[in-house]
Amino acid sequence: MPKVTVYNQTGSQVGEIELAEAIFGIEPNEAVLFEAVVMQRASLRQGTHKVKNRSEVSGGGRKPWRQKGTGRARQGSIRSPQWRGGGTVFGPTPRSYAYKLPKKVRRLAIKSALATKVVENNIVVLEDLVLNAPKTKDMVAVLKGLAVEKKALIVTADVNEAVELSARNIPGVTVITADGVNVLDVLHHDKLIMTKAAVEKVEEVLA
């Protein structure tokens, strides 16, 4: 079982915690991580693209000129795709790009993302994270005590409004709950900061 140092809010070591081998100690599966990231990014696409086809563009319904006798190519409508201002054929229409990987694959991807942070030594476990009031400077002090200078993902066991409000104005810092742990957020941030309660909750969900 991988062991990680536990810190308090001031950055002092207060002990160690053994992380679940089946979650934090597995060999990261890069192929599954790739598939999970592609899936998440696809679901973030708006899909609001739209062009008009020949039934939607403006223009008359009458035949531009008679069929025979003019010497010109026969035409049936000025809304045909070969005309300037005509409709588009097989153009993009509004659609959802979201899709889901199998549940086992999604769970393996999250485990692989968490294990990656352990391998890189980029996971920090806090004994607890308690802020009396939403103040950005208090959160900055916590991060400074933990020597976190890059992008950080803070995972709490439950919704903590004071923590969320204190971190939202700090560039590169994101706060989520243990239920919302996902591959894209974990990999996007350099440091993963979890409370002990959050670790226990994640292990309970992914066990």
From Swiss-Prot:
Q: Which UniProt keywords apply?
A: Ribonucleoprotein, Ribosomal protein, RNA-binding, rRNA-binding
List the InterPro entries: Ribosomal_uL4 (IPR002136), Ribosomal_uL4-like (IPR013005), Ribosomal_uL4_dom_sf (IPR023574)
Region (Disordered): which ranges?
48-89
Recorded GO molecular functions are: rRNA binding; structural constituent of ribosome
Q: Does the keyword Ribosomal protein apply?
A: yes
Write out the GO biological process terms.
Answer: translation
Q: Which GO terms describe its cellular component?
A: ribonucleoprotein complex; ribosome
Q: Which family does it belong to?
A: Belongs to the universal ribosomal protein uL4 family.
Assembly and binders: Part of the 50S ribosomal subunit.
The protein's name in its UniProt record: Large ribosomal subunit protein uL4
Q: Which organism is it from?
A: Bacillus cytotoxicus (strain DSM 22905 / CIP 110041 / 391-98 / NVH 391-98)
